[in-house]
Each structure stands twice: as structure tokens, then as C-alpha cells.
């Protein structure tokens, strides 16, 4: 029945089930530790998220990946994450300059970046719901979180298309 709902999203469903499981474990054996391995599909292809999460990023990548790389480095310098004299790393040869793409390619790749960003933020929000549930149980200070998110650069879907 859930999957027939047009608003269904697997990450949200996983989070709901994880919260139920943690709450059940805590209710049944409050003095025992629990272990939960919570591995979402994000941000592996296909990149999908609820529409409102993708729409938040509408137009934010229209300047392309070259401009985004420069803005990201500038922001990292401003925040003190990297030294002021840090230079932009070379871009891989198989990634073309944004300005060399056709208008249709730019539109497609900007949309893909919007979907990726929306998917990543939606997943982060769902992890936050799980953390909140553990906090409401009074177990947050007694819980170790190991939060790993990788770009999975070696997966088959790498490349532009």
C-alpha cells in the first residue's frame, strides 16, 4: 500500500522503520545497548527525491560545474576550511568545460545536479529524524553515530551520461 502512494519515498520508509525498531528495542530492553546499521540508497543512482526537495535547488546550478568549483573553493577559504593560498585542483580531463556544452546538455546536467543535491539533503533530513527519535528516548548522549556518505566514484554510473 505504501508503494502505491505517489508521495512514497524509500528513504523515508527506511527511516520510519528504523525509528520503530529502535523504539521497540528500547521499550523491550531499556538496559541493553542496540546496534542499527542504517544504509540508505543515497546518493546512488537513480538520483531521486521528493519533488519539493529537488525544487529547492531549481536554478542553483545553472552557472555550471566550473563556476560551482570556483565558488566552493572561495567559500572554503572564507570559512577557514582550506588555507588562503589553496588553488583549485585540476578538473579531470573527461569532464568538459561547462561553456563547451550545448544548451540542452547544460539544462540536463543542471537538472541532474539539482536532483543530486535534493536527494542528499532529503537523506540528511531523514538521518536527522532518526537522531531526533533517539534523543527523544533519552539515549542520544549514550549513542555512537558513525555517519558515512561517499560519492561512490567507482560505480558503473560514473561519467556524464
Residue ranges and their predicted role:
Residues 1-161:
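Active-site-proximal cap/lid insertion segments
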